[in-house]
């Protein structure tokens, strides 16, 4: 007799079909291969992907079947620029200055730079001809006013230096003496008028000085006279001489020191 087919309860309770060892080995190989591929991708790209919009570096199609990277393109441009031959620049004609003393040409100098005075450095005489004077000396010696130095065109140029006598004082303004003399002649017309004005001012100063001196002497004499009078009046005692009979009952005595007369009656 044949064996009867198992019922539903018997099928559920029976054992499930087992996986073969070959299938398990294949699954393990696939898992390891997937891990190896993942690690390879991470090793090739260790940093996170850049933000959107930052694509790979752009290249230039050379038309020869390959792209030229940016660095290679810059190097090629540099080499091309080195191969360019520029024509020589034309020779420039400079506007040379003519020294007013020696007549030679020069490019620049101390007096030209600071005072716009055409004299080269070789001819500069800082101790005599091209001497610098202070603003006070320019006003007193050449009778110039502030407007003559600061407002009259062209305005005189100057340099500023520390006061050598005391650094705490204000800075000095130094002018070129030649330019100050030229400005004084423009103001006064000629040298004779300047000398006359200087003599008049000198005489006026002498008169004012003498007047102040006389006033002080007068005040001193008055003070001395007043002190002597007070001293004499405070300590003088009359020394009368013999009395004289002026009238029947009137007599007088005279001080032998100051001449004071004392008149009195005697009964």
Swiss-Prot record:
It comes from the Eukaryota. InterPro entries: DNA-bd_dom_put_sf, XPA/RAD14, XPA_C, XPA_CS, XPA_sf, Znf_XPA_CS. GO terms for cellular component: nucleoplasm; nucleotide-excision repair factor 1 complex. Residues 46-60 have a biased composition (Low complexity). A zinc finger (unnamed) spans 99-123. GO terms for molecular function: damaged DNA binding; zinc ion binding. This is DNA repair protein complementing XP-A cells homolog. It comes from Gallus gallus.
